[in-house]
Amino acid sequence: MKILVVDDFSTMRRIVKNCLQEIGYTEIQEADDGNTALPMLQSGSFDFLITDWNMPGMPGLDLLKAVRADAKLAKMPVLMLTAEAKREQIIEAAQAGVSGYVIKPFTAATLKEKIDKILATKAAA
């Protein structure tokens, strides 16, 4: 499975990448914001998107909306990472079509649990 990790903070991208590798995912690419990520998603063959919420340029929610609006990408699973646990944000992300939500800080086990749940839901659809 090919995963794109999007976060403006390189240390956070590295943490996510290390967690993914720890749980068995090896095909991982990175982008530093939505403006960089969207063309990569459109031209690449990614299976899964993990994006931060708060980023300059194109924030995660805008990236999520762009992915859902693109016929080729619309069904791609999207996991949103954020330090914010505000109810309004969670609702906004759900309405925009997010597949799952992880609040920072998190462990590799939490990430695995969320990814497994999203993939199981996708397989059942």
Q: Could you say what each language-model-derived stretch is?
A:
Residues D33-T36, P59-K65:
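Acidic catalytic/metal-coordinating carboxylates
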Residues I28, L49, Y101-V102:
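Two-component signal transduction core modules
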Residues F106-I115:
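C-terminal output helix
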